[in-house]
Amino acid sequence: MTLSRVHQQVIAFPAVNTAPVGYLPDPASINKLQIPTSSKVSMLQKKKTDSFTNGARDQDKLGPKLTETVKRKLSLGAKILQMGGLEKIYKRLFKVCDKEKLFKAYQCYLSTTEGSIAGLLFISSKKIAFCSERSIKVTSPQGDLTRVHYKVSIPLCKINGVNQSQNTKKPSQRYLEVVTVDNYDFWFMGFVSYQKAFNCLEKALNEDEQ
């Protein structure tokens, strides 16, 4: 099946990476809204739902471990210092455009059809980009097993909107849904700093529109 041009630009499929397995520390853990045409974020609001999406089920599985998020955050900070800072990690993992500025990176999980994947969500002045903490096994076109990092890269100009959702039965379970102009959606959950991540993404989108 041929992917649309937008989909090709949005998704960076897993690619072999020379980084060591587990470039980040093991984590101690780990609805929809009409998109306004005038602004991507001016009308953002939360929508609660009783139905369980794949993302909700994923976070149910993660729930018991979320009590250790403080330890997880401290471990991440130590590892980032060891690697030389977020900028170096970001440039090592993704292609950086001219004048692109990295704002922040947040530990979270990306929901996939195969389950949730722990990693870092980078937010910059040009895109959001996710990379799994650990490499995963995939089969190459030649039929060989290889280990790769799972990556997703979405240019800000291809984001149609960002929605906040939460589980009505478990309000502490909160999600960010990123919807592209081609109507593909990406669910992020299990944030150590959920509101800070949303505010940072909102700021990036606002600045991109200016």
From Swiss-Prot:
GRAM domain span: 88-166
Gene3D superfamilies recorded: Pleckstrin-homology domain (PH domain)/Phosphotyrosine-binding domain (PTB)
Chain segments annotated as coiled-coil in the UniProt record: none
Domain of life assignment: Eukaryota
Similarity field: Belongs to the GEM family.
Cited PANTHER family: GEM-LIKE PROTEIN 2
Entry protein name: GEM-like protein 7
Lineage of the species this protein comes from: Eukaryota, Viridiplantae, Streptophyta, Embryophyta, Tracheophyta
